Amino acid sequence: MHQTNQENRFRAWELLLDREEFRESTLRRLRTEEESPVLVLATCQRLEVYGHRLPDLEGVSIRHEWTEARAVERFARIAAGLESRILGELEVMGQVRQAYKDFHLVHGANWQELDRIFQQGVSLG
């Protein structure tokens, strides 16, 4: 029972790819994950994933992990452009909106809690 509660906690991960050639297959796998969907934010500067559980991935390591309120705060800060090299950078905000659209297109309203978190974050940008 305790493990299930752990898996249901909202999380954010900053990922590092062991090799750049893994990028496209990793992104495809993350974006189509059915069992525990995640929002994937891939920019030239970062690869971040938001959801409840990170699927098993080869050639990927976790650089940072945030849980619950800190994960929500992380997504909000990214969406608002506060973590960009240039404060409020519009390009990152557009990438966040596109990541949310991609998530919603694949997973729709089946994951209401995640959808609500992502909607609120996107509204900050």
Show the residue positions of the predicted features:
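Signature of alpha-helical transmembrane segments in polytopic membrane proteins
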Residues: 36, 60-61, 81
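Short beta-strand
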Residues: 37-43, 66
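Short amphipathic beta-strand starts and helix->beta connectors
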Residues: 29-37
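Short glycine-/aliphatic-rich beta-strand segments at the starts of folded cytosolic domains
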Residues: 1-27
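Glycine/serine-rich phosphate-binding loop and adjoining beta1-alpha1 elements at the start
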Residues: 64-125
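Short cationic amphipathic helices and targeting signals
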Residues: 15, 45-51
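Helix N-cap motif at beta-to-alpha junctions
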Residues: 51-58
